[in-house]
Amino acid sequence: MQNEIKKVCVIGSGVMGSGIAALIANSSHKVVLLDIIAKDSDDPNKIVKTAKENLHKQKPPPLSFPDKVNFITIGNLEHDLELIRDCDLVIEVIVEKLEIKHQLYNKIIPYLKEDAIIASNTSTLPLKRLKENLPDNIKSRFVITHFFNPPRYMELLELIIDSMVKFEVIERVSGFLTKTLGKTIVKCNDTPGFIANRVGCFLLELVARKAISQKLDFVALDKIFTICLGLPSTGIFGLYDLIGHDVMKLISSSLLAALPANDAYHKIYVNTPVLDKMIEKKLIGRKGEGGFYRLSVSNGKKIKEVININDLSYSSVQKVDISFNNLDELLVSDSVYGKIFTEIITEFYVYLASLVPSVTDNIYDIDAAMKLGYSWKYGPFELLTIAAKDGWNSVIKNADLMHIPLPQYLGNKEYQKIDKQKFNSHKDILQESQIVLENDSAKLINYRENFIFVITTKMNCLNHNVFYLLQEAASKAEKDGKNLYIYPQGNNFSAGADLKLLLSYIEDGNFHDLENLLKLGQQTMLHLKYSGVHIISCAKGVALGGGCELLLYSSYIVANQELNAGLVELGVGLIPGWGGVTEMFVRSKGDKTKLIRNVRNIIEQNKTSSADYFKSDYDVESMHVNMNKHYILDEALKLNLSKKIVPIPHKITLPKINLATEIDTSKYNDLQNKVLSKFQNIIDKHPDTNEEELLGYEREIFLELAKDPKTIEKLKAIVK
């Protein structure tokens, strides 16, 4: 693509800046990371060098694979400005002080390519202020790209532009942020706090200050907001602690300074001395000595405690029972918490109404910002379709929402998000397709003359009917000379076997049918492996157990970077039974080092934290890693694969090796040692073998483990 962004410079190597640099490196793009000179060291790059080194230490890890750090070149703002010259995008991530930002812009402008885009990661300063006194040719390619922390894991990105920004600049930067970095963009008007923090912090401050003034139970309120409104398990007060009371004060102070006096944020931000007192005593949340909650240790056990706002003492969190189980019940409840919730939610929607269209004219962007930036299950406007219409009547009336085109959505269970990202959603694909084959667990569809296999079970779990239809689909694809694409519904590729089905066989002592299920799965995997056409798996989310085996037997994988995949069956007392053990032995190719690694994958339940790790740890050769999970099918369909060279079954020679001496088993439990012994037995007694024999040994071990009472206990614990 012409003018494609190939190299990026990030200025500012703090947690956010280095995190953005790591994200870019994860996409295998070159990135320059610059910062000021260290005044207390002979090494001018000490600050940025330390930041780069810390990328290997942070939790959760910013890098998808250790080697990705090699895409990052470091330097300082005195000696290394020349490194900017060939960068297509420069992202500024420095202190939130306008004067310092302006000084930086003036310093780097002489080094910019004539079509380089400048972006600020500010979360508080207006775009119009950032652009003050800049040349027009810079203003036309200057935007705000507000990443959320941590950049690798938070999908939301707020993009702020104005009328001066050229259309081609918007297209270039948007394409890079979505397709290359995997972000979902919400376009915001140039208003204080943009969308997510303006809405999210308003609700946090509203609830916290009202709860303190009315002496409400924090634990009860958190439970209400989690169960009834779909907030994450942190609730309101846990999230306040997670962000940090000191940070919340900075954000709110910044917003209040920028917002007009008639904005409702001023009204709800009532003086609450106890919050200031908590900050004084370093009770600022998780990074301090406590917050609204804290964790203490008693007799080696962690205990969650909640603060007593009167004297700032703590007591253990007690279980609270609320009298409603969903939003419908809450909105019509006459209880104290029902009334206070209605009061809060009305005030919240009054504020939301005031933001349309000044902050955004698209209510779907508000929903996306809260779901992706604050991890809400539903966006606030989407919630209007979740609860019964009658429950919202008073809220809508009091909040004056009628000037927003909402009534058509009330009670509409088919609430449809307006999709501006130009990718094909699962729903779109199904709507545009014709069903070729179908049963109660899967379907084969024809999508734009391509065969797509879709599993329709919960979490895409595997069972008989999935395997039957998959074999039929592969045969159909082979007959028609078309590749077969396995594409997941929902957010995950496959959670593996249907454990309820396995448990029912084991509890009934029906090991004959269990073995037949193992054989069916193994036959299906071999069918895929030796098919005359490519079997291309589009993997995202989790691919565990049988889901991982399905990937290993595909001829090509297009995987989202955040894929979590692995052979984890030992966690329920079993081993991979649909060819996973066999394929790990086959992929060792007689090499001792590979065999040790592959055996450990199974015994240590190696669930990889990224597609890069899966490719390395599981010896996957034919894989394309993609940063945006929404584009995996699009990218798979664009693959220009040569005709498949069908592998030929061959003799497998296992190396002479003593696994117990080559692997550190000091932390292994009895089950792990037992399985290791079983694998050693195969190596010792069957050094020259083949796939069919290995599959037989695999079934034999699986069935023996299935008869262990401890396996039943583990399965029951998970299936509950």
UniProtKB/Swiss-Prot annotation:
Region: Enoyl-CoA hydratase/isomerase, residue numbers: 453-720
Matching InterPro entries: 3-OHacyl-CoA_DH_NAD-bd, 3HC_DH_C, 6-PGluconate_DH-like_C_sf, ClpP/crotonase-like_dom_sf, ECH_dom, NAD(P)-bd_dom_sf
Name of a matching Pfam family: ECH_2
UniProt keyword annotations, A-Z: Fatty acid metabolism, Isomerase, Lipid metabolism, Lyase, Multifunctional enzyme, NAD, Oxidoreductase
BP GO annotations: catabolic process; fatty acid metabolic process
Bridged cysteine pairs (disulfide): none
Catalyzed reactions: a (3S)-3-hydroxyacyl-CoA + NAD(+) = a 3-oxoacyl-CoA + NADH + H(+); a (3S)-3-hydroxyacyl-CoA = a (2E)-enoyl-CoA + H2O; a 4-saturated-(3S)-3-hydroxyacyl-CoA = a (3E)-enoyl-CoA + H2O; a (3Z)-enoyl-CoA = a 4-saturated (2E)-enoyl-CoA
GO molecular function, one term: enoyl-CoA hydratase activity
Region (3-hydroxyacyl-CoA dehydrogenase): 1-384
EC nos: 1.1.1.35, 4.2.1.17, 5.3.3.8
Coiled coil regions in record: none
The organism's place on the tree of life at top rank: Bacteria
PANTHER family per record: 3-HYDROXYACYL-COA DEHYDROGENASE FAMILY PROTEIN (PTHR48075), 3-HYDROXYACYL-COA DEHYDROGENASE-RELATED (PTHR48075:SF7)
Family: In the N-terminal section; belongs to the 3-hydroxyacyl-CoA dehydrogenase family. In the C-terminal section; belongs to the enoyl-CoA hydratase/isomerase family.
Record-given protein name: Putative fatty acid oxidation complex trifunctional enzyme
Organism: Rickettsia felis (strain ATCC VR-1525 / URRWXCal2) (Rickettsia azadi)
Lineage: Bacteria, Pseudomonadati, Pseudomonadota, Alphaproteobacteria, Rickettsiales
